[in-house]
C-alpha cells in the first residue's frame, strides 16, 4: 500500500474545493447543513499571505485529507493570545487513518509557531463523522483537545421556496412552505443612513469593534491593517450606518453557498459593531442588509449567536435560532492557560 505523505499545501485551492465537495456531499449530503468552499475565498482566508498553515495528506498523488488554519489574536479576559483558527478538516472516507496524522502535524506546527490555542468548530449532530471523531479524540487525548462550549446560528429565510426544497428536516420544509411570506418579512426596507464601507471609515470601524467587544469574555483582537484587509476584500461586503457625518454602526458579511438537500445561496454575517445606535437603528441596519441581499438573489442569512450580534434586532427582523448548532473545540499547547466556557464571546468561525 502506498505511503501517506503529509506536506504543506501549495496550490490554487481549486482541487481542495473539489475534494471538499466530493467528501462532504458523500458524508453529509441531505443529512445536515454545511458550507461549500469557494477557492478564491480560501486563497484569501488561509493562503500564504494570511499566514495560514495548511497541512494536507496525499496518497499516490491523490489528495486524501486536509486541515487549514489562519492566525489571529484572541483576547481572553484581560490577556491577548496568539491563536490559530482551524477549518476544513476533511478526510476521505477510504483513508480515515490519516486523520490522526493530520491532527498531530497541526498540533506540532502551532506549537512551533508560538500559538497559545488552536480553535475550531465541531458539528453538534451526534450522527456526523465530525462529532464522532472530535468527541472521541477529546476523550482519548484530554490534554491535547477539549470541547469548551456550545452555541449556534441565527437564520433568516429570504427565499422560502428554495429553502422548502433544500431543508434537511421535514419541519424546515413545511415551515417554509406554509409561513414563507412571514419568514421573509422585514420591518423596514432600505434606510437612507446606510451606505457601503469606504476606506476612510477604517479607524472608526476599528474603534467601534474594540469598544463593542470590550466587555466580552472572549473577543477577536483586530489590528487596523488586519481589519482593513477583510473590509476591503472583494469576497466580503460591508455596510455602515452614518448619521450626522459620523459612522455609528457597521456590518460585514460574505457569500456562503450552503448545502442542504439542495444548494442554496447564503450570506454569513461575520462582524457587527455599533456605538451610539439604539434598538430602532439596529433593526433598520439589519433590515437594510436583508433587503439588499434579497434583491441580489440570496436565499438565507446566517450569523453566529454570539454576544457581538444584537439579539433584539435579529428577533425583530424574524431571524430564528437555526436547528443546527456547533461546539467550539480548543487545542492546547505549552503556552495555553486554563479556560472556562465564556458567557459572552465573539469568534470568526467560518
Model region roles, listed by residue range:
Residues 202-252:
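Non-catalytic interaction/regulatory modules that flank or connect domains
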Residues 40-56, 65, 139-144, 229-240, ...:
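A short helix-loop-beta-strand connector motif used in the catalytic cores of GNAT acetyltransferases and
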Residues 1-58, 63, 84-85, 177-222, ...:
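Short amphipathic alpha-helix that is part of the acyltransferase structural core
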Residues 17, 21, 25-35, 77-85, ...:
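Extended intrinsically disordered, low-complexity coil regions enriched in Ser, Thr, Gly, Ala
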Residues 118-183, 237, 243, 249-350:
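Active-site/acyl-donor-binding loops of N-acyltransferases
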Residues 86, 95-110, 120, 278-291:
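Conserved acetyl-CoA-binding loop-helix of GNAT-fold acetyltransferases
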Residues 54-56, 62-72, 85, 246-257:
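Conserved beta-strand in the GNAT
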Residues 65-101:
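Long, hydrophobic/aromatic-enriched structural stretches that serve as scaffold segments
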Amino acid at each position: 500500500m502506498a505511503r501517506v505523505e503529509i506536506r504543506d499545501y501549495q496550490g490554487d485551492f481549486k482541487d481542495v474545493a473539489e475534494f471538499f465537495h466530493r467528501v462532504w456531499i458523500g458524508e453529509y449530503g441531505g443529512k445536515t447543513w454545511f458550507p461549500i468552499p469557494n477557492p478564491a475565498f480560501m486563497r484569501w482566508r488561509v493562503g500564504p499571505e494570511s499566514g495560514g498553515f495548511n497541512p494536507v495528506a496525499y496518497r499516490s498523488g491523490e489528495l486524501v485529507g486536509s486541515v487549514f488554519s489562519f492566525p489571529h489574536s484572541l483576547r481572553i479576559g484581560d490577556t491577548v493570545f496568539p491563536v490559530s483558527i482551524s477549518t476544513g478538516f476533511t478526510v476521505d472516507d477510504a483513508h480515515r487513518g490519516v486523520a490522526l496524522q493530520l491532527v498531530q502535524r497541526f498540533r506540532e506546527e502551532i506549537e512551533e509557531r508560538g500559538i497559545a490555542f488552536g480553535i475550531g468548530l465541531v458539528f453538534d449532530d451526534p450522527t456526523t463523522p465530525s462529532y464522532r471523531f472530535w468527541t472521541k479524540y477529546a476523550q482519548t487525548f484530554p490534554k491535547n483537545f477539549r470541547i469548551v462550549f456550545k452555541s449556534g446560528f441565527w437564520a433568516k429565510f429570504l427565499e422560502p421556496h428554495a429553502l422548502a426544497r433544500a431543508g434537511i428536516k421535514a419541519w424546515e420544509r413545511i415551515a417554509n412552505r406554509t409561513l414563507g411570506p412571514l419568514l421573509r418579512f422585514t420591518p423596514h426596507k432600505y434606510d437612507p443612513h446606510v451606505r457601503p464601507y469606504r476606506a476612510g471609515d477604517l479607524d472608526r470601524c476599528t474603534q467601534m469593534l474594540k469598544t463593542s467587544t470590550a466587555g466580552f469574555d472572549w473577543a477577536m483582537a483586530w489590528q487596523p491593517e488586519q481589519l482593513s484587509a477583510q473590509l476591503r476584500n472583494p469576497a466580503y461586503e460591508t455596510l455602515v450606518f452614518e448619521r450626522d457625518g459620523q459612522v455609528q454602526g457597521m456590518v460585514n458579511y460574505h457569500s456562503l453557498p450552503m448545502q442542504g438537500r439542495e444548494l442554496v445561496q447564503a450570506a454569513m454575517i461575520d462582524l457587527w459593531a455599533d456605538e451610539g445606535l439604539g434598538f430602532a437603528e439596529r433593526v433598520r441596519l439589519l433590515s437594510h442588509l436583508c433587503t439588499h441581499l434579497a434583491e441580489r438573489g440570496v436565499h438565507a442569512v446566517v450569523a453566529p449567536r454570539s454576544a457581538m450580534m444584537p439579539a433584539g434586532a435579529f428577533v425583530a427582523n424574524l431571524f430564528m435560532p437555526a436547528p443546527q448548532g456547533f461546539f467550539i473545540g480548543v487545542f492546547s499547547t505549552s503556552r495555553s492557560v486554563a479556560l472556562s466556557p465564556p458567557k459572552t464571546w465573539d469568534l470568526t468561525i467560518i
